[in-house]
Amino acid sequence: MNAKTYEALETMQKRLFQIQKDLEDENILKDIKKFTELNKEKANLEEVVEKFVEYKKAVDHIKDAKAILENEKDSELIELAKIELDENNDKVEHLQQVIEEMLLPKDPNDEKNVIIEIRGAAGGDEANIFAGDLLRMYKLYAETQNWKINILEASLGEAGGYSQVVFMIKGDRVYSKLKFESGAHRVQRVPKTEAKGRIQTSTATVAVLPEMSEVEIEIRSNDLRIDTYRASGAGGQHVNTTDSAVRITHLPTGIVVTSQDGRSQHDNKDIAMTMLRAKVYEAEVEKQQAQADATRKNAVGTGARSEKIRTYNYPQNRVTDHRVGLTLNKLDQVMEGNIDEFIIALINEEQRQKVAEQLKNNE
């Protein structure tokens, strides 16, 4: 382990000790905000410090074993020292790798809830139907994670599915698992409307946005145009006699969001503002990426809505993720929400890229 990393870990260990002392202070116990902040910092430090303590113990055992090998003449003790040395050398190597991975830059949004927007793209009715299939897939996956899902806005397709659907998923580390779903999802299958049984290729796009708080994304009221109108059901039929639906336009970016499924105009405005903050954040990130180098440092793919990320081939019961080259011959299970294999492969690829970048920076 290099000296800079070791020094940083020593600082973390001292900081954790100080936090533990502070959390016993009566004044801090009374200050809910400070208490919460310290507990969060403590949680972020505990695991890496625990591994560092294990690492230091293993290093001490190596020193002791070497001392025995240098000075001891008893063959039995020498043999035991050799075993101890081998075991702890392996342990140090493993712990160093674990610690270095834990110290890699973390995505600050990984802990957040998400807003997902699915749109039927190329392929007309079939694209809309597939957008509905993807929504169902994410709903089923959310159930396995004990996450809560809430539809924010939906436009039904004429033949089924959705031309657009926006929904929120709340739970533990949702963004960390679903952020790689952004992009174009391509489906190859025979549409129900196809009389001759020909395979058609259609596309639905997915955008996964972290939920942003008012503090993180500040939107000035004078940058908004807010229009109200009557909420309507399928076919444009009025289902509400009051102007409860809300359309908000963010004037600096031209972003428009609408909400009509809330119980009141106030609810719809809150929902629309939640969607707007996420979309303004997305626009800002895209702007920064456009200004950055062509080779992005932290991405498995670009995350752009237009980037083809996955193909779902129904006739062959096959799904391929093009970013990691992973093919699963169990499309039926994937569409039932079993997407963990893709998620794990993508997380591992992101980790691999971060390690490679870190090594490059250390050269």
Curated annotation (Swiss-Prot):
PTM comment: Methylated by PrmC. Methylation increases the termination efficiency of RF1.
PROSITE patterns with a match to the protein in the record: RF_PROK_I
Classification via SUPFAM superfamilies: Release factor (SSF75620)
UniProt-listed InterPro entries: PCRF, Pep_chain_release_fac_I, Pep_chain_release_fac_I_sf, Prokaryotic/Mito_RF, RF-1
One GO location term (cellular component): cytoplasm
Principal place of residence: cytoplasm
N5-methylglutamine carried by residues: Q237
Subcellular location field: Cytoplasm
Family stated for the protein in its record: Belongs to the prokaryotic/mitochondrial release factor family.
HAMAP family from the UniProt entry: Rel_fac_1 (MF_00093)
Function text: Peptide chain release factor 1 directs the termination of translation in response to the peptide chain termination codons UAG and UAA.
Protein name (Swiss-Prot/TrEMBL): Peptide chain release factor 1
Species of the source: Mycoplasma capricolum subsp. capricolum (strain California kid / ATCC 27343 / NCTC 10154)
